[in-house]
């Protein structure tokens, strides 16, 4: 029995970046031998075991063969005679197909085992497929795109890009289940440069299949006085990258991605103006979230940002009454944490514009001060003083909030 650390841990070690977790492959063992040594079986489709002390995953060396469409359509073969090279050959990219032997005490020993020249491609900053078997698993397109968001200075090898396009043309991407698409998109959005993920997906044609609402934004012009970058797709990528640079949460980054979807459906005869695009964005976003099973916290923030970002940009023009109505409409009084994320997404929208990345955004501070004032109103005390008429209570609380905001901002109602 020989144990090897494989994949991302070796890649990251060679790149000099922190290794988050390790994957292990065991060569020359049977499931019975693993169990006898205290490993706990957890794999469903193929033998994966948890180490009795560290609880890290150890998989028996295996090969795989495509038997049906989609990423579930594989038949696995594992046996003590499956070699390390055979196991590495089934992996997606050369930079993920390297290994080092592990000693009994868990330390890495010996040289890097690199049968597919992954070290060469690391030095060249290239994503390259290990073999033509890459075409058998459509998830690999999403994974490669996600890696592009993490390693933003890497490029895709020409022959690898050609394989990805063949997969898209063959409909392989259409077989992906929504949960897996969302999982990879979400992970890519949380990387350092999400725009690189979308660039790769566009280059191979996959974005039009999995997120046609986003793909349709490129080539749509905007007013240059508001958007010096002009192209809506370019703008949205700048917004997402700004959100990533600020280390904003996944809901904020998803809201940044989807806030302008409606601009793709603006009639040609009114371009480059986009009057009413906020409502059209909401209409596109709802079925998108349903289709990809987007988590509620991401969906809810994205919807309110899509609907209200134009209004939020104009809050410097609002009086106290309009601000309180805005807080009520966005549920900011009950959900201040979500409203804070809404401010982040809208600030990213304002700064995701060519040459305007550092422009002031006083709207955010104005709204923070105003919301704090509105939430300081003691609705319970007003209710006790007003009586049992719910309509009168509601009106009194509303008026008190307007007065509080007006006082805090020193503005008229």
Swiss-Prot record:
<dbReference type="InterPro" id="IPR002646">
    <property type="entry name" value="PolA_pol_head_dom"/>
</dbReference>
<dbReference type="InterPro" id="IPR050124">
    <property type="entry name" value="tRNA_CCA-adding_enzyme"/>
</dbReference>
<dbReference type="Pfam" id="PF01966">
    <property type="entry name" value="HD"/>
</dbReference>
<dbReference type="InterPro" id="IPR032828">
    <property type="entry name" value="PolyA_RNA-bd"/>
</dbReference>
<keyword id="KW-0692">RNA repair</keyword>
<keyword id="KW-0547">Nucleotide-binding</keyword>
<feature type="binding site">
    <location>
        <position position="146"/>
    </location>
    <ligand>
        <name>ATP</name>
    </ligand>
</feature>
<keyword id="KW-0067">ATP-binding</keyword>
<keyword id="KW-0808">Transferase</keyword>
<comment type="function">
    <text>Catalyzes the addition and repair of the essential 3'-terminal CCA sequence in tRNAs without using a nucleic acid template. Adds these three nucleotides in the order of C, C, and A to the tRNA nucleotide-73, using CTP and ATP as substrates and producing inorganic pyrophosphate. tRNA 3'-terminal CCA addition is required both for tRNA processing and repair. Also involved in tRNA surveillance by mediating tandem CCA addition to generate a CCACCA at the 3' terminus of unstable tRNAs. While stable tRNAs receive only 3'-terminal CCA, unstable tRNAs are marked with CCACCA and rapidly degraded.</text>
</comment>
<dbReference type="Pfam" id="PF01743">
    <property type="entry name" value="PolyA_pol"/>
</dbReference>
<keyword id="KW-0479">Metal-binding</keyword>
<feature type="binding site">
    <location>
        <position position="91"/>
    </location>
    <ligand>
        <name>CTP</name>
    </ligand>
</feature>
<dbReference type="GO" id="GO:0004810">
    <property type="term" value="F:CCA tRNA nucleotidyltransferase activity"/>
</dbReference>
<dbReference type="GO" id="GO:0005524">
    <property type="term" value="F:ATP binding"/>
</dbReference>
<keyword id="KW-0511">Multifunctional enzyme</keyword>
<feature type="binding site">
    <location>
        <position position="146"/>
    </location>
    <ligand>
        <name>CTP</name>
    </ligand>
</feature>
<dbReference type="GO" id="GO:0001680">
    <property type="term" value="P:tRNA 3'-terminal CCA addition"/>
</dbReference>
<dbReference type="GO" id="GO:0042245">
    <property type="term" value="P:RNA repair"/>
</dbReference>
<dbReference type="GO" id="GO:0016791">
    <property type="term" value="F:phosphatase activity"/>
</dbReference>
<feature type="binding site">
    <location>
        <position position="23"/>
    </location>
    <ligand>
        <name>Mg(2+)</name>
    </ligand>
</feature>
<feature type="binding site">
    <location>
        <position position="143"/>
    </location>
    <ligand>
        <name>ATP</name>
    </ligand>
</feature>
<dbReference type="Pfam" id="PF12627">
    <property type="entry name" value="PolyA_pol_RNAbd"/>
</dbReference>
<comment type="similarity">
    <text>Belongs to the tRNA nucleotidyltransferase/poly(A) polymerase family. Bacterial CCA-adding enzyme type 1 subfamily.</text>
</comment>
<keyword id="KW-0819">tRNA processing</keyword>
<comment type="subunit">
    <text>Monomer. Can also form homodimers and oligomers.</text>
</comment>
<dbReference type="InterPro" id="IPR043519">
    <property type="entry name" value="NT_sf"/>
</dbReference>
<feature type="binding site">
    <location>
        <position position="91"/>
    </location>
    <ligand>
        <name>ATP</name>
    </ligand>
</feature>
<dbReference type="GO" id="GO:0000049">
    <property type="term" value="F:tRNA binding"/>
</dbReference>
<dbReference type="InterPro" id="IPR006674">
    <property type="entry name" value="HD_domain"/>
</dbReference>
<dbReference type="GO" id="GO:0004112">
    <property type="term" value="F:cyclic-nucleotide phosphodiesterase activity"/>
</dbReference>
<feature type="binding site">
    <location>
        <position position="21"/>
    </location>
    <ligand>
        <name>Mg(2+)</name>
    </ligand>
</feature>
<feature type="binding site">
    <location>
        <position position="11"/>
    </location>
    <ligand>
        <name>CTP</name>
    </ligand>
</feature>
<keyword id="KW-0378">Hydrolase</keyword>
<keyword id="KW-0533">Nickel</keyword>
<feature type="domain" description="HD">
    <location>
        <begin position="232"/>
        <end position="333"/>
    </location>
</feature>
<dbReference type="GO" id="GO:0000287">
    <property type="term" value="F:magnesium ion binding"/>
</dbReference>
<keyword id="KW-0548">Nucleotidyltransferase</keyword>
<keyword id="KW-0460">Magnesium</keyword>
<feature type="binding site">
    <location>
        <position position="143"/>
    </location>
    <ligand>
        <name>CTP</name>
    </ligand>
</feature>
<keyword id="KW-0694">RNA-binding</keyword>
<feature type="binding site">
    <location>
        <position position="8"/>
    </location>
    <ligand>
        <name>ATP</name>
    </ligand>
</feature>
């Amino acid at each position: 029995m020989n144990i090897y650390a494989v994949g991302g841990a070796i890649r990251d070690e060679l790149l000099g970046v922190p290794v988050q977790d390790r994957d292990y492959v065991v060569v020359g063992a049977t499931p019975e031998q693993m169990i006898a040594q205290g490993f706990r079986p957890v794999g469903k489709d193929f033998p994966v075991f948890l180490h009795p002390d560290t609880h890290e995953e150890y998989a028996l060396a295996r090969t795989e063969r495509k038997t049906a469409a989609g990423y579930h359509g594989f038949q696995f073969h594992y046996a003590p005679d499956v070699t390390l090279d055979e196991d590495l050959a089934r992996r997606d990219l050369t930079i993920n197909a390297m290994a080092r032997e592990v000693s009994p005490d868990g330390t890495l020993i010996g040289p890097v085992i690199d049968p597919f020249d992954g070290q060469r491609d690391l030095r060249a900053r290239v994503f390259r497929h290990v073999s033509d078997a890459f075409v058998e698993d459509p998830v690999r397109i999403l994974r490669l795109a996600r890696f592009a968001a993490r390693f933003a200075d890497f490029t895709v090898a020409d022959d690898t890009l050609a394989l990805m396009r063949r997969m898209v043309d063959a409909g392989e991407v259409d077989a992906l289940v929504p949960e897996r698409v969302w999982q990879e998109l979400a992970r890519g959005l949380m990387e350092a440069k999400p725009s690189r993920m979308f660039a790769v997906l566009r280059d191979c044609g996959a974005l039009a299949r999995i997120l046609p609402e986003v793909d349709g934004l490129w080539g749509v012009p905007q007013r240059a006085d508001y958007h010096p970058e002009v192209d809506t797709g370019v703008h949205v990528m700048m917004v997402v990258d700004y959100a990533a640079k600020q280390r904003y949460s996944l809901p904020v980054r998803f809201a940044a991605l989807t806030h302008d979807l409606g601009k793709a459906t603006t009639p040609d005869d009114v371009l480059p103006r986009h009057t009413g695009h906020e409502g059209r964005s909401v209409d596109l976003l709802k079925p998108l979230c349903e289709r990809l099973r987007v988590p509620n916290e991401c969906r809810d923030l994205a919807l309110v940002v899509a609907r209200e970002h134009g209004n939020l940009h104009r809050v410097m023009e609002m009086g106290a009454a309009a601000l309180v109505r805005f807080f009520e409409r966005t549920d900011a009084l009950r959900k201040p944490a979500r409203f804070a994320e809404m401010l982040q997404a809208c600030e990213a929208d304002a700064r995701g514009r060519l040459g305007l990345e550092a422009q002031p955004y006083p709207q955010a501070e104005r709204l923070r001060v105003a919301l704090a004032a509105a939430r300081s109103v003691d609705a319970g005390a007003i209710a006790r003083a007003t009586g049992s008429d719910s309509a009168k209570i509601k009106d009194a609380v509303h008026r008190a909030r307007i007065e509080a905001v007006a006082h805090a901002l020193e503005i008229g109602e």
